[in-house]
């Protein structure tokens, strides 16, 4: 799969990861990128054991088109496919990293 990094993601990455010298979290994000690049589509990724290790999830209800991955107890990486919503996992071959969310998970 192809990963596209948005400006919001790069800003959050520098602000929340780089400036605070979170080496463990930086390594985890690099591992997530390698795993996503290793698969051809989301169906293969969701069938692999990495789905449970890194907690890949699809949001529910009105945020159905958003996927999240746990970085640590506080931070989650938010991703969105670059195709229109009524899709199945085989069609998803490009993901955009939207941002790093730290608002709804407490202080870790």
Name each model-derived stretch.
Residues 28-35, 55, 71, 75:
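Amphipathic alpha-helical interface surfaces
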Residues 23, 50, 82-86:
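Short, charged helix-to-loop "capping" segments that act as catalytic/coupling loops
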Residues 14, 57-60, 108:
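Short, solvent-exposed polar/charged micro-motifs at secondary-structure junctions
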Residues 1-5, 54, 108:
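An acidic, glycine-rich, mixed-charge low-complexity segment common to nucleic-acid enzymes
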Residues 42-67:
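A short, surface-exposed loop/turn module that caps and links secondary-structure elements
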Residues 66-108:
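Enriched for short, Lys/Arg-rich terminal
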Residues 1-37:
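Arg/Lys-rich, positively charged N-terminal/basic patches that mediate binding to nucleic acids
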């Amino acid at each position: 799969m192809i990963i596209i990094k948005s400006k919001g993601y790069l800003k959050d990455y520098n602000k929340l990861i780089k400036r605070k010298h979170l080496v463990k979290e930086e390594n985890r994000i690099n591992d997530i990128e390698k795993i996503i690049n290793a698969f051809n589509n989301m169906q293969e990724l969701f069938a692999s054991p990495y789905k449970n290790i890194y907690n890949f999830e699809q949001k529910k209800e009105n945020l159905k088109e958003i996927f999240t991955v746990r970085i640590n107890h506080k931070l989650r990486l938010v991703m969105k496919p670059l195709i229109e919503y009524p899709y199945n996992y085989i069609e998803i071959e490009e993901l955009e990293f939207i941002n790093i969310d730290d608002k709804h998970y407490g202080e870790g």
